[in-house]
Amino acid sequence: MSDSVPNYLFVKEEVSLREYKMYKYLHNMELPFIPKLYRYDKTTRKLDMQRIIGMSVADFYGEAFDCVPKKIISEIRNIIRYLYNIGVVYPDITGYNFIVDKNSKVWIIDFEHCFYINNLQNKNDIIFDKFDNNIPDKDEHINFVVNFSFNNENN
């Protein structure tokens, strides 16, 4: 790819194969809150994906949870809950990993720390087996995600 990047493209550098596989897995499901995936180069570890025109939640509203509108928090919870229900645990819930576009749609990015829960995994889908069996603090991450997405509906 040349130095000039088309305006529809975002190039993320230093992407692990594990993170790429998670992006690819979710991209193939055509989820409306995941940017489109175009290409991954295993040699350079660059991931080419859809550029979302907008700002991160943290940049737009600030880093304090209380400053983020309840509607945005609810959308983030819905995304995290949906991912959990399909077996993906996304513990890196920070305002910098969610983008609000010009239409106020919330997008999720950065799957470096997420992992697949093997007990929910389709037995024919072994893409994550060797990557997600030894996640440090796995149970704590799962509990955090469950508490955030299922137990905090009023705030």
Residue ranges and their predicted role:
Residues 33-73:
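Conserved structural core of kinase catalytic domains
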Residues 85, 101-155:
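C-lobe/activation-segment region of protein kinase-like
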Residues 85-95, 100:
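Catalytic-loop of the protein kinase fold
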Residues 53, 95, 113:
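Short, glycine/acidic-enriched loop or turn micro-motifs at the edges of active sites
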Residues 1-25:
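ATP-binding glycine-rich loop module of kinase domains
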